[in-house]
């Protein structure tokens, strides 16, 4: 009886798997290197990611009366109702004391400035963006200590 049952299972499994290709017939594609040269579309999107939209439309390179050339700006996006933003504020105050006029911090309340938040793709709060010469140096979408911000800024001064 056991032999008959084993034979029936073997015959049924043979008919069930008759359409499955044999492993010998399967052709493996050559392994591609994960590091490939950037194509023109990748370069375009990389350039778009690194360039920062202007805060105010003007023919000069000034934001709020401050020349953007060789100046580091910290854009700080927050909301009054955000608990982590309330913790981030004092950290930025420490940063202002450390660097003085070398670093300019612009605080942007997303409840009052929704357009700017949309242009900068703000998805989480608090968000801190460090910019120099209109290029994003760092973007943090979480709470960041003043020591972490200081080390990032010192690399680019």
From Swiss-Prot:
Which PROSITE patterns does this entry report, sorted A to Z? THIOREDOXIN_2 (PS51352)
Share the record's PTM remark. Answer: The disulfide bond between Cys-82 and Cys-85 acts as a redox-active center and is reduced by thioredoxin reductase TRXR.
Q: Which residues form the signal peptide?
A: 1-22
Q: Disulfide bonds, which pairs?
A: 82-85
* Molecular function as annotated in GO: protein-disulfide reductase activity
* Entries under Pfam families matching the protein: Thioredoxin
Which SUPFAM superfamilies does the entry mention? Thioredoxin-like
What if the gene is knocked out?
Answer: Mice of infection with knockout parasites have reduced blood parasitemia due to a slower growth at the ring and schizont stages. Parasite burden in vessels of lung and adipose tissue is reduced. Also, the development of experimental cerebral malaria is delayed. In infected host erythrocytes, surface expression of parasite antigens is reduced.
Q: Record's InterPro entries?
A: Thioredoxin-like_sf, Thioredoxin_domain
Could you name the active-site residues?
Answer: 82 (nucleophile), 85 (nucleophile)
Give the UniProt entry's GO cellular component terms.
Answer: cytoplasm
- Give the family, as the similarity comment puts it: Belongs to the thioredoxin family.
Q: Name the job this protein performs.
A: Participates in various redox reactions through the reversible oxidation of its active center dithiol to a disulfide and catalyzes dithiol-disulfide exchange reactions. As part of the translocon PTEX complex, plays a role in the export of parasite proteins into the host erythrocyte. The translocon PTEX complex is a multi-protein machinery resident in the parasite parasitophorous vacuolar membrane, responsible for protein secretion into host cells.
* Subunit composition and interactions: Monomer. Component of the translocon PTEX complex composed of HSP101, EXP2, PTEX150, PTEX88 and TRX2.
What name appears for this protein in its UniProt entry?
Thioredoxin 2
- Gene name as annotated: TRX2
